[in-house]
Amino acid sequence: QWGNHDILWMGAAAGCRACVATAIRIALRYSNIDAIEDGYGISLLPLVSFAQHVYKDDPCTRFMPKVNDKKPFDVDAELLAKMHKAISIIQFKVEENIIEQNPAYNMEHRRLLRTLNPAAGTVEIEGKTYPLNDTSFPTIDPAHQTALTDEEQHLIDTLTNTFATSEKLKQHVRFLYAKGSMYRRYNDNLLFHACLLLNEDGGFKQKEIDGAVYYGRSLMDKYDQMAREAYFSGQNADFLWFLWCNQDSTLFGKTKMTTFERYFIDDKETHKEPSSPYYKLMEQDDGTLAARILKEFGLSGNAHI
Protein backbone atom coordinates (compact mmCIF):
# COMPACT_ATOMS: atom_id res chain seq x y z
CA GLN A 1 0.00 0.00 0.00
CA TRP A 2 1.24 3.48 -0.85
CA GLY A 3 2.35 5.95 1.81
CA ASN A 4 2.17 9.71 1.51
CA HIS A 5 5.90 9.99 0.78
CA ASP A 6 5.45 7.49 -2.07
CA ILE A 7 2.67 9.70 -3.39
CA LEU A 8 4.88 12.79 -3.17
CA TRP A 9 7.47 11.26 -5.50
CA MET A 10 4.77 9.80 -7.73
CA GLY A 11 3.39 13.32 -8.05
CA ALA A 12 6.81 14.75 -8.84
CA ALA A 13 7.32 12.14 -11.56
CA ALA A 14 3.86 12.96 -12.94
CA GLY A 15 4.85 16.61 -13.35
CA CYS A 16 3.16 18.21 -10.35
CA ARG A 17 5.23 21.31 -9.61
CA ALA A 18 4.20 21.42 -5.94
CA CYS A 19 5.37 17.83 -5.46
CA VAL A 20 8.67 18.57 -7.22
CA ALA A 21 9.31 21.62 -5.03
CA THR A 22 8.37 19.71 -1.87
CA ALA A 23 10.57 16.72 -2.68
CA ILE A 24 13.55 19.02 -3.26
CA ARG A 25 12.78 21.05 -0.13
CA ILE A 26 12.73 17.96 2.09
CA ALA A 27 15.98 16.70 0.57
CA LEU A 28 17.63 20.05 1.25
CA ARG A 29 16.25 20.25 4.78
CA TYR A 30 18.01 17.00 5.62
CA SER A 31 21.05 17.58 3.38
CA ASN A 32 20.13 14.54 1.31
CA ILE A 33 20.41 15.87 -2.22
CA ASP A 34 22.48 12.87 -3.32
CA ALA A 35 19.25 10.89 -3.71
CA ILE A 36 18.09 13.41 -6.29
CA GLU A 37 21.32 14.17 -8.12
CA ASP A 38 23.14 10.84 -7.98
CA GLY A 39 20.16 8.53 -7.53
CA TYR A 40 17.97 9.98 -10.25
CA GLY A 41 20.40 12.01 -12.33
CA ILE A 42 18.48 15.22 -11.69
CA SER A 43 20.70 18.30 -11.73
CA LEU A 44 20.01 20.98 -9.12
CA LEU A 45 22.47 23.41 -10.70
CA PRO A 46 19.66 25.68 -11.94
CA LEU A 47 18.50 26.01 -8.32
CA VAL A 48 22.08 26.67 -7.18
CA SER A 49 22.45 29.54 -9.66
CA PHE A 50 19.06 30.99 -8.79
CA ALA A 51 19.61 30.84 -5.03
CA GLN A 52 23.10 32.33 -5.20
CA HIS A 53 21.79 35.25 -7.24
CA VAL A 54 18.41 36.00 -5.64
CA TYR A 55 19.31 35.26 -2.01
CA LYS A 56 22.92 36.47 -2.11
CA ASP A 57 22.29 39.06 0.65
CA ASP A 58 20.12 36.76 2.79
CA PRO A 59 21.96 34.43 5.21
CA CYS A 60 18.83 32.20 5.29
CA THR A 61 19.73 31.11 8.83
CA ARG A 62 16.28 29.62 9.43
CA PHE A 63 16.88 27.30 6.50
CA MET A 64 20.18 25.77 7.51
CA PRO A 65 20.01 22.01 6.83
CA LYS A 66 19.60 19.53 9.64
CA VAL A 67 22.97 18.16 10.74
CA ASN A 68 23.59 14.55 9.79
CA ASP A 69 26.44 13.22 11.95
CA LYS A 70 26.83 10.15 9.76
CA LYS A 71 27.09 12.16 6.56
CA PRO A 72 28.94 15.50 6.67
CA PHE A 73 28.00 18.22 4.20
CA ASP A 74 29.73 17.89 0.86
CA VAL A 75 28.18 21.19 -0.22
CA ASP A 76 28.55 24.51 1.59
CA ALA A 77 25.85 24.67 4.29
CA GLU A 78 25.09 28.33 3.57
CA LEU A 79 24.49 27.51 -0.08
CA LEU A 80 22.17 24.66 0.90
CA ALA A 81 20.28 27.11 3.13
CA LYS A 82 19.79 29.55 0.25
CA MET A 83 18.62 26.74 -2.04
CA HIS A 84 16.33 25.51 0.74
CA LYS A 85 14.65 28.89 1.20
CA ALA A 86 14.39 29.52 -2.54
CA ILE A 87 12.57 26.25 -3.26
CA SER A 88 10.38 26.66 -0.15
CA ILE A 89 9.02 30.00 -1.35
CA ILE A 90 8.38 28.50 -4.78
CA GLN A 91 6.60 25.57 -3.13
CA PHE A 92 4.29 27.87 -1.16
CA LYS A 93 3.46 29.87 -4.28
CA VAL A 94 2.62 26.91 -6.51
CA GLU A 95 0.62 25.27 -3.71
CA GLU A 96 -1.55 28.35 -3.33
CA ASN A 97 -2.11 28.41 -7.07
CA ILE A 98 -3.29 24.79 -6.93
CA ILE A 99 -5.68 25.66 -4.10
CA GLU A 100 -7.06 28.60 -6.08
CA GLN A 101 -7.57 26.44 -9.18
CA ASN A 102 -9.22 23.60 -7.22
CA PRO A 103 -11.91 24.98 -4.88
CA ALA A 104 -13.17 21.41 -4.35
CA TYR A 105 -10.01 20.76 -2.32
CA ASN A 106 -11.46 23.04 0.42
CA MET A 107 -8.06 24.44 1.33
CA GLU A 108 -8.69 28.19 1.22
CA HIS A 109 -7.57 28.41 4.85
CA ARG A 110 -4.10 27.32 3.74
CA ARG A 111 -3.56 30.27 1.40
CA LEU A 112 -1.27 32.03 3.84
CA LEU A 113 0.77 34.13 1.41
CA ARG A 114 -2.30 36.26 0.74
CA THR A 115 -2.12 37.62 4.28
CA LEU A 116 1.66 37.95 4.37
CA ASN A 117 2.78 41.49 5.24
CA PRO A 118 6.59 41.64 5.13
CA ALA A 119 6.59 45.40 5.81
CA ALA A 120 4.72 44.88 9.08
CA GLY A 121 6.44 41.57 9.71
CA THR A 122 3.18 39.66 10.15
CA VAL A 123 0.96 36.98 8.66
CA GLU A 124 -2.66 36.19 9.41
CA ILE A 125 -3.68 32.57 10.02
CA GLU A 126 -7.27 31.55 10.69
CA GLY A 127 -8.19 35.06 11.82
CA LYS A 128 -5.20 35.65 14.10
CA THR A 129 -2.13 37.75 13.32
CA TYR A 130 1.33 36.38 14.11
CA PRO A 131 4.80 37.98 13.94
CA LEU A 132 7.20 36.56 11.37
CA ASN A 133 10.71 35.49 12.34
CA ASP A 134 11.98 36.30 8.84
CA THR A 135 10.85 39.17 6.60
CA SER A 136 13.21 38.74 3.66
CA PHE A 137 11.05 37.83 0.65
CA PRO A 138 12.84 39.19 -2.43
CA THR A 139 10.60 37.32 -4.90
CA ILE A 140 7.22 38.14 -3.34
CA ASP A 141 5.30 41.05 -4.86
CA PRO A 142 3.09 42.59 -2.12
CA ALA A 143 0.37 43.15 -4.72
CA HIS A 144 0.56 39.59 -6.08
CA GLN A 145 2.01 37.42 -3.32
CA THR A 146 1.50 34.07 -5.03
CA ALA A 147 2.80 35.08 -8.46
CA LEU A 148 6.04 33.42 -9.52
CA THR A 149 8.72 35.71 -10.87
CA ASP A 150 9.89 34.95 -14.40
CA GLU A 151 13.04 33.38 -12.96
CA GLU A 152 11.07 31.25 -10.49
CA GLN A 153 8.73 30.13 -13.26
CA HIS A 154 11.60 29.10 -15.50
CA LEU A 155 13.33 27.33 -12.62
CA ILE A 156 10.36 25.24 -11.48
CA ASP A 157 9.46 24.40 -15.08
CA THR A 158 13.03 23.20 -15.68
CA LEU A 159 13.14 21.15 -12.49
CA THR A 160 9.71 19.65 -13.14
CA ASN A 161 10.76 18.58 -16.62
CA THR A 162 13.90 16.89 -15.29
CA PHE A 163 11.85 14.97 -12.70
CA ALA A 164 9.29 13.90 -15.30
CA THR A 165 11.96 12.73 -17.76
CA SER A 166 14.27 10.93 -15.30
CA GLU A 167 14.35 7.33 -16.51
CA LYS A 168 15.40 5.95 -13.12
CA LEU A 169 12.61 7.82 -11.32
CA LYS A 170 10.15 6.72 -13.98
CA GLN A 171 11.22 3.11 -13.44
CA HIS A 172 10.76 3.35 -9.67
CA VAL A 173 7.40 5.11 -9.89
CA ARG A 174 6.03 2.63 -12.41
CA PHE A 175 7.04 -0.12 -9.98
CA LEU A 176 5.04 1.63 -7.24
CA TYR A 177 2.02 1.80 -9.53
CA ALA A 178 2.40 -1.82 -10.62
CA LYS A 179 2.83 -3.28 -7.14
CA GLY A 180 1.15 -0.72 -4.89
CA SER A 181 -2.32 0.63 -4.20
CA MET A 182 -4.30 2.74 -1.74
CA TYR A 183 -5.03 -0.35 0.34
CA ARG A 184 -4.56 -4.10 0.18
CA ARG A 185 -6.36 -7.14 1.53
CA TYR A 186 -3.83 -9.87 2.23
CA ASN A 187 -4.13 -13.06 4.28
CA ASP A 188 -7.10 -11.75 6.29
CA ASN A 189 -5.35 -8.44 6.90
CA LEU A 190 -6.50 -5.01 5.74
CA LEU A 191 -3.41 -2.92 4.99
CA PHE A 192 -3.44 0.82 4.44
CA HIS A 193 -1.28 3.82 5.29
CA ALA A 194 -2.52 6.42 7.80
CA CYS A 195 -6.30 6.26 8.10
CA LEU A 196 -9.81 6.01 6.74
CA LEU A 197 -12.00 9.10 6.55
CA LEU A 198 -14.38 9.05 9.50
CA ASN A 199 -16.71 11.57 11.07
CA GLU A 200 -16.44 12.41 14.78
CA ASP A 201 -19.28 9.95 15.50
CA GLY A 202 -17.42 7.09 13.82
CA GLY A 203 -19.45 7.02 10.64
CA PHE A 204 -17.72 6.95 7.27
CA LYS A 205 -17.15 10.48 6.02
CA GLN A 206 -18.74 11.06 2.62
CA LYS A 207 -16.80 12.79 -0.12
CA GLU A 208 -18.39 14.17 -3.28
CA ILE A 209 -16.25 13.86 -6.41
CA ASP A 210 -17.55 14.91 -9.83
CA GLY A 211 -21.15 14.72 -8.65
CA ALA A 212 -20.93 11.24 -7.10
CA VAL A 213 -20.63 10.42 -3.39
CA TYR A 214 -17.96 8.04 -2.08
CA TYR A 215 -17.04 6.77 1.38
CA GLY A 216 -15.15 3.92 3.02
CA ARG A 217 -13.94 1.39 0.50
CA SER A 218 -15.55 3.14 -2.46
CA LEU A 219 -13.60 6.31 -1.62
CA MET A 220 -10.33 4.41 -1.38
CA ASP A 221 -11.07 2.78 -4.74
CA LYS A 222 -11.87 6.18 -6.28
CA TYR A 223 -8.68 7.73 -4.92
CA ASP A 224 -6.73 4.77 -6.31
CA GLN A 225 -8.29 5.26 -9.73
CA MET A 226 -7.61 9.00 -9.71
CA ALA A 227 -4.00 8.49 -8.58
CA ARG A 228 -3.38 6.20 -11.55
CA GLU A 229 -5.10 8.52 -14.00
CA ALA A 230 -3.05 11.45 -12.69
CA TYR A 231 0.17 9.74 -13.75
CA PHE A 232 -0.74 7.70 -16.81
CA SER A 233 -3.09 10.19 -18.48
CA GLY A 234 -0.80 13.15 -17.91
CA GLN A 235 -3.74 15.17 -16.58
CA ASN A 236 -4.60 16.37 -13.08
CA ALA A 237 -1.20 15.54 -11.59
CA ASP A 238 -2.07 17.99 -8.82
CA PHE A 239 -4.40 15.35 -7.35
CA LEU A 240 -1.30 13.53 -6.16
CA TRP A 241 -0.42 16.66 -4.16
CA PHE A 242 -3.96 16.50 -2.69
CA LEU A 243 -3.18 12.98 -1.49
CA TRP A 244 0.08 14.23 0.03
CA CYS A 245 -1.38 16.90 2.32
CA ASN A 246 -5.16 17.35 2.15
CA GLN A 247 -7.33 16.81 5.22
CA ASP A 248 -9.51 14.46 3.18
CA SER A 249 -6.59 12.31 2.06
CA THR A 250 -6.53 8.89 3.69
CA LEU A 251 -2.74 8.91 3.22
CA PHE A 252 -2.23 12.09 5.26
CA GLY A 253 -4.42 11.65 8.34
CA LYS A 254 -4.19 15.23 9.64
CA THR A 255 -6.26 18.39 9.31
CA LYS A 256 -3.42 20.50 7.90
CA MET A 257 0.29 20.47 7.09
CA THR A 258 1.93 23.42 8.85
CA THR A 259 5.13 23.71 6.83
CA PHE A 260 4.96 27.51 6.44
CA GLU A 261 4.32 28.01 10.14
CA ARG A 262 7.28 25.85 11.17
CA TYR A 263 9.62 27.97 9.08
CA PHE A 264 8.32 31.47 9.68
CA ILE A 265 6.43 31.58 13.00
CA ASP A 266 7.98 30.96 16.42
CA ASP A 267 4.65 30.37 18.19
CA LYS A 268 4.57 26.57 18.42
CA GLU A 269 0.79 26.55 18.74
CA THR A 270 0.71 27.23 15.00
CA HIS A 271 2.92 24.21 14.34
CA LYS A 272 0.33 21.71 15.53
CA GLU A 273 -1.19 19.34 12.99
CA PRO A 274 -4.34 17.85 14.56
CA SER A 275 -4.98 14.24 13.62
CA SER A 276 -8.06 13.00 11.79
CA PRO A 277 -10.89 11.53 13.94
CA TYR A 278 -9.88 7.99 12.93
CA TYR A 279 -6.99 7.79 15.39
CA LYS A 280 -8.88 8.82 18.53
CA LEU A 281 -11.83 6.64 17.58
CA MET A 282 -9.64 3.60 17.05
CA GLU A 283 -7.86 4.17 20.38
CA GLN A 284 -11.24 4.12 22.13
CA ASP A 285 -12.70 1.31 20.05
CA ASP A 286 -13.96 -1.84 21.74
CA GLY A 287 -13.74 -3.72 18.45
CA THR A 288 -17.05 -2.51 17.04
CA LEU A 289 -15.54 0.11 14.74
CA ALA A 290 -12.76 -2.20 13.59
CA ALA A 291 -15.33 -4.89 12.76
CA ARG A 292 -17.38 -2.37 10.77
CA ILE A 293 -14.32 -1.23 8.84
CA LEU A 294 -13.31 -4.81 8.06
CA LYS A 295 -16.84 -5.61 6.90
CA GLU A 296 -16.75 -2.57 4.62
CA PHE A 297 -13.74 -4.13 2.92
CA GLY A 298 -15.22 -7.62 2.74
CA LEU A 299 -13.34 -9.07 5.71
CA SER A 300 -14.60 -10.54 8.97
CA GLY A 301 -13.83 -13.18 11.60
CA ASN A 302 -10.19 -13.11 12.66
CA ALA A 303 -9.17 -10.42 10.19
CA HIS A 304 -6.95 -7.55 11.34
CA ILE A 305 -6.29 -3.94 10.36
Regions from the language model: what does each represent?
Residues 1-305:
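Feature recognizes metal-dependent phosphohydrolase scaffolds
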